[in-house]
């Protein structure tokens, strides 16, 4: 057996080397029939020699279209001439609009040029002639099941993106293979493909600028970064794709933040979140009954830790079946009493729903079967997998009736009058995840052999009273045709492909591309196949949990890189890791540190697995203290956070920023992924090593202020050591030049928090100036009837408040304290000419504190002199 394995390995290695050699011998394409109207260039591409057919059949005739869509965005698409090859549907990904301008090609920030035989192209910056994309060193390969395109890179590139992954923020650039194929990935291991796919990278070149490259393609792919063979050894980035077309969007930047905004113009802006969504969330897989959930809520209250939203995992379901309730452990009367209790106290409730529907005797399945909305096998029968409830069916999201079916199930089960009156929903397992190994020919056997669904815990009487809770919670009381037989439209995929075992094998950690997911030869209701659309299943949302992480220091650390990837690169800003870790048993020290760090994720939730120890923050005294401290800081900053998040929903300007986004010319920031900016003002620098009570942090050449004291610190572009950092503390610094609006105090819920007046922290830059903003709305409505967008400017001793003041509230719309950090002398204060001596100055800290009354209902001005 061992000898046979070695023989197979040798054959495989020889095959790979042979394939690689054959790829370099492919003829590429030659150009003809070029048409250029100044805005759009079109050309025909024809195979330039004998087909190489390495991983499929070469497509002999292609076409090229180049559009100068905006001043900063260039669109380049290479597709088959007949448009039979699959392309991402417009219904899933609406294409960005193009600005019509006949002279765009001569004025755009980016310039396209090409060589006609063999075809290659370059994209350069018009202002500097710097080449940012160059395919001339390797032939274009466009086959039925394989596409390859290689571009040159600088010698020491700074690349970011190409996720989802748990690797460093700045990608390694030697022998890197990043695979894009959505996978349910317990433990989120580094170096593997994870839950989502984002085929975009940012190339940051310091003073030369930053550009972005987005490939609109949902097929599985390997993106390789390395050095060419030989003495030259030039760096390259290479796409190896299982199908689709080459549909590129180039974004000129030139700053990292501008690239982020330009990318948002292509993929769409994220949705705004409710104000309460930024509070603390608590969940666990393994709450045994409704009383257990209620007791957690009670314990948080008793510990004095503000809990905004309670969650329940799949435990509430009857046999893990979606849209059902375990009537013995989570009876409807107890669930409704729990939700009513939370709502009466301005708290919220969320449950999980998986996309897979239990196959068999349940109403949700029967309705879906009647409406014909489930994925089908080749024989027309409902495709079966195995997930938590056992044998399952999967909604076909391309079926025209699926959305109505799904909406109706929600309407029935979450009926506010009769069902569970939830405030939001958690969708999980939507990679799509399937426990059953490929080929999953006997899902019923898998269910039986793996004891699905898991046995629920024994039913128990309510064990003890919970003071203040309702009586209910107290003791004692594959053919490429549509299903209708019509022919497929164009751009739906070529016939004759091997949809299960393609000739080119991407480095999917799960092995076969059909393993642990839906079979890739399944045909959707609109005729598209799962092979092409797998990476689209369940990806049209903009709120993201980073998956089943582990309670380990390494995962605590790389969660920072992950949140930065999603918020700053992929335009998915409502993101967070499971605080204290999902899998394994967290230590007290790690949980305390994570409670502090998690307060600076946009999405802040403690969640863990049924097999791990309970890890609610109140389980340890030190973690309780850390959580209280962290939430107190977060809540005082919540309007600053809310404003930064709103800004990203309007412009794409990230709510979280790597240091190089703020200091793009400082080379020492390019690789930093253990510090980050929340918004533009707040530098977060957590302790990241076990047992450490100090942390070495980098401060760029700028003025900073200690968050806790206001003490100025001159950054010199060097590392400094923060000493005596206990597990209940996290180093925070304001950046000079920023004005930060804060609530005067924290609160137990975000509803109460909104009743607090404001304070302004004016952090002077080296010239004595600062600016900031504040966004206000009602915090909940999908369509906001009245909003305020307020600008603060401090210049030459004058604070100006201007902007739009449409949001009106009976209370809390005033600034009662102003703190000026970096002020160098005592002063008097004039407010519209009236002297106000109610101020204090700390000469050592250079901190001025002023009591004020500035209404946020209209413009105002205050002079400090």
UniProtKB/Swiss-Prot annotation:
Subcellular location: Secreted
A Pfam family of this chain: Glyco_hydro_31_3rd
Enzyme class name: hydrolase
GO cellular component assignments: extracellular region
One term of GO molecular function: beta-glucosidase activity
Domain of life assignment: Eukaryota
The reaction(s) this protein catalyses: Hydrolysis of terminal, non-reducing (1->4)-linked alpha-D-glucose residues with release of alpha-D-glucose; Hydrolysis of terminal, non-reducing beta-D-glucosyl residues with release of beta-D-glucose
Glycan-modified residues: 101, 299, 515, 549, 585, 748
Keyword Hydrolase: yes
Signal peptide: 1-21
Residues of the active site: 428, 431, 548
Record-listed E.C. numbers: 3.2.1.20, 3.2.1.21
GO biological process: cell wall organization; polysaccharide catabolic process
PANTHER family documented for this protein: ALPHA-GLUCOSIDASE (PTHR22762), ALPHA_BETA-GLUCOSIDASE AGDC-RELATED (PTHR22762:SF67)
Similarity annotation: Belongs to the glycosyl hydrolase 31 family.
Name this protein carries in UniProt: Probable alpha/beta-glucosidase ARB_02101
């Amino acid at each position: 057996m061992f000898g046979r394995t070695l023989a197979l390995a040798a054959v495989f290695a020889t095959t790979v080397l042979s394939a690689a050699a054959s790829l370099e011998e492919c003829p590429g394409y030659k150009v003809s029939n070029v048409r250029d109207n100044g805005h759009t260039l079109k050309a025909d591409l024809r195979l330039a020699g004998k087909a190489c057919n390495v991983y499929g059949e070469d497509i002999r005739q292609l076409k090229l279209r180049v559009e100068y869509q905006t001043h900063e965005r260039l669109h380049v698409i290479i597709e088959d001439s007949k448009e039979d090859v699959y392309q991402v549907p417009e219904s899933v990904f609406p294409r960005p609009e193009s600005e019509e301008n006949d002279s765009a090609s001569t004025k755009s920030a980016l310039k396209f040029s090409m060589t006609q035989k063999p075809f290659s192209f370059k994209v350069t910056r018009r202002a500097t002639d710097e080449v940012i994309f160059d395919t001339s060193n390797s032939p274009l390969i466009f086959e039925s099941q394989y596409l390859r395109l290689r571009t040159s890179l600088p010698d020491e590139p700074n690349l970011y993106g190409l996720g989802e992954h748990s690797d460093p923020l700045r990608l390694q650039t030697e022998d890197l293979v990043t695979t894009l194929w959505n996978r349910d990935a317990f433990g989120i291991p580094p170096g593997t493909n994870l839950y989502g796919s984002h085929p975009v990278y940012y190339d940051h070149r310091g003073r030369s600028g930053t550009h972005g490259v987005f490939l609109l393609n949902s097929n599985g792919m390997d993106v390789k970064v390395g050095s060419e063979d030989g003495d030259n050894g030039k760096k390259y980035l290479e796409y190896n794709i299982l199908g689709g077309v080459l549909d590129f969007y180039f974004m000129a930047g030139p700053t990292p933040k501008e690239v982020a905004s330009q990318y948002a113009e292509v993929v769409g802006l994220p949705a705004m979140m409710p104000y309460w969504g930024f509070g603390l969330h608590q969940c666990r897989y393994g709450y045994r009954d409704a009383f257990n959930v209620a007791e957690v809520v009670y314990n948080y209250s008793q510990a004095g830790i503000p809990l905004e939203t309670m969650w329940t995992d799949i435990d509430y379901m009857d046999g893990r079946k979606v849209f059902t309730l375990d009537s013995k452990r989570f009876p409807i009367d107890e669930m409704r009493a729990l939700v009513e209790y939370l709502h009466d106290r301005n708290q919220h409730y969320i449950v999980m729903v998986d996309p897979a529907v239990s196959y068999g005797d349940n109403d949700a399945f029967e309705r879906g079967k009647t409406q014909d909305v489930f994925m089908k096998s080749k024989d027309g029968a409902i495709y079966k997998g195995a997930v938590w409830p056992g044998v399952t069916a999967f909604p076909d999201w391309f079926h025209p009736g699926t959305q109505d079916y799904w909406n109706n199930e929600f309407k029935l089960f979450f009926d506010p009058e009769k069902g569970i009156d939830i405030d939001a929903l958690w969708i999980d397992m939507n990679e799509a995840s399937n426990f059953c190994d490929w080929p999953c020919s006997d899902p019923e056997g898998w269910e039986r052999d793996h004891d699905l669904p898991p046995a629920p815990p024994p039913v128990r009487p309510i064990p003890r009273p919970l003071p203040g809770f309702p009586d209910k919670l107290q003791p004692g009381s594959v053919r490429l045709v549509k299903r209708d037989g019509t022919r497929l439209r164009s751009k739906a995929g070529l016939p004759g492909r091997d949809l299960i075992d393609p000739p080119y094998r991407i480095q999917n950690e799960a092995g076969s591309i059909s393993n642990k997911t839906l079979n890739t030869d399944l045909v959707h209701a609109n005729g598209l196949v799962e092979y092409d659309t797998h990476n689209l299943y369940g990806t049209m949302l903009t709120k993201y949990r980073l998956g089943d992480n582990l309670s380990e220091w390494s995962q605590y650390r790389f969660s920072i890189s992950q949140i930065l990837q999603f918020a700053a690169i992929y335009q998915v800003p409502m993101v967070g890791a499971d605080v204290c870790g999902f899998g394994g048993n967290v230590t007290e020290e790690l949980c305390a540190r994570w409670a502090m760090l998690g307060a600076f994720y946009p999405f802040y939730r403690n969640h863990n697995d049924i097999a791990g120890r309970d890890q609610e923050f109140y389980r340890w005294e030190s973690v309780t203290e850390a959580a209280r401290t962290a939430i107190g800081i977060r809540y005082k900053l919540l309007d600053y956070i809310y404003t930064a998040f709103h800004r990203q929903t309007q412009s794409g300007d990230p709510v979280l920023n790597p240091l190089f986004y703020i200091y793009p010319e400082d080379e020492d920031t390019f690789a930093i992924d253990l510090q980050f900016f929340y918004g533009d003002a707040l530098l977060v620098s957590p302790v990241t090593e076990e047992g450490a009570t100090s942390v070495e942090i980098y401060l760029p050449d700028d003025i900073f202020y200690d968050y806790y004291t206001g003490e100025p610190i001159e950054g010199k572009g060097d590392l400094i050591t923060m000493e005596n950092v206990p597990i209940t503390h996290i180093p925070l610094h304001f950046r000079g030049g920023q004005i930060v609006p804060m609530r005067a105090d924290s609160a137990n819920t975000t509803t109460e928090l909104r009743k607090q007046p404001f304070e302004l922290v004016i952090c002077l830059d080296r010239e004595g100036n600062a600016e900031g903003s504040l966004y206000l709305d009602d915090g909940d409505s999908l369509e906001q009837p009245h909003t305020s967008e307020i600008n603060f400017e401090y210049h030459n001793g004058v604070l100006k408040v201007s902007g739009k003041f449409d949001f009106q509230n009976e209370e809390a719309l005033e600034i009662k304290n102003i703190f000026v950090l970096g002020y160098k002398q005592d002063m008097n204060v004039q407010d519209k000419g009236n002297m106000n001596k109610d101020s204090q100055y700390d000469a050592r800290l250079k901190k001025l504190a002023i009591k004020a009354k500035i209404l946020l209902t209209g413009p105002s001005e205050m002079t400090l002199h």
